[in-house]
């Protein structure tokens, strides 16, 4: 990892902005979602849990667009690595990008808008946890697909800065999952218990 640092200036403003957006985004949506789950204040403010969830989802989408922009600007402002600047690496990056898009888009299709954007924190639950593709082949495919997108983008640009930022994306997602996965498992366990009692 240390060899990457020789190709970048960590004080460069666009790099700092990329780091901030990468760390902030999952922190923001987890804090807001937990707050909503405890207080239901967003649902009351917007008049319904669905409208509140849609509003948070739009905020998350806009933040993710900003994160991707900052990521790209950080790569463009730092030098390329000659050893990565070749056709093989470019097409490898393209493959990762394609793989990432497949997992992100298929996850969105399987979960729907509210399932993707934390609807369970708003009390909007599916009949059961989704286990169809891509969840049948990979846990948390939305997060790992997103990480693959950033990795592919970094490789296509022969960017050591992009590779380092991709590692940060992966670390932040792993930390987020430490909070998200137990919650999701628990709410569906509670739902199954309630349904069992009714039957």
UniProtKB/Swiss-Prot annotation:
Membrane-topology annotation of the record:
Multi-pass membrane protein
Name the domain of life. Eukaryota
Q: Where do transmembrane segments lie in this chain?
A: 46-66, 94-114, 158-178
Q: Which residues form a coiled coil?
A: none
Keyword field: Endoplasmic reticulum, Lipid biosynthesis, Lipid metabolism, Membrane, Methyltransferase, Mitochondrion, Phospholipid biosynthesis, Phospholipid metabolism, S-adenosyl-L-methionine, Transferase, Transmembrane, Transmembrane helix
* Single GO cellular component term: mitochondrial membrane
Protein name, please?
Answer: Phosphatidylethanolamine N-methyltransferase
Query: What gene name is given for the protein in this entry?
Result: Pemt
């Amino acid at each position: 990892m240390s060899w990457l640092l020789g190709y970048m200036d960590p004080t460069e403003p666009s790099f700092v902005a990329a780091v901030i957006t990468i760390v902030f985004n999952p922190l923001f949506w987890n804090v807001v979602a937990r707050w909503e789950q405890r207080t239901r204040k967003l649902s009351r403010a917007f008049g319904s849990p669905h409208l509140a969830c849609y509003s948070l989802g739009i905020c998350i989408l806009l933040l993710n667009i900003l994160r991707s922009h900052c990521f790209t600007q950080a790569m463009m402002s730092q030098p390329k690595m000659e050893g990565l600047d070749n056709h093989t690496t470019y097409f490898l990056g393209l493959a990762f990008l394609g793989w990432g898009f497949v997992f992100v888009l298929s996850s969105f299709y399987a979960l729907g808008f509210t399932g993707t954007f934390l609807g369970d924190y708003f009390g909007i639950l599916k009949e059961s946890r989704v286990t169809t593709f891509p969840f049948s082949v990979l846990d948390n495919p939305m997060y790992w697909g997103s990480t693959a997108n950033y990795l592919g983008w970094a490789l296509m640009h022969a960017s050591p800065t992009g590779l380092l930022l991709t590692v940060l994306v992966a670390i932040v997602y792993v930390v987020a999952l430490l909070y998200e996965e137990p919650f999701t498992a628990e709410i569906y366990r509670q739902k199954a218990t309630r349904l069992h009692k009714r039957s």
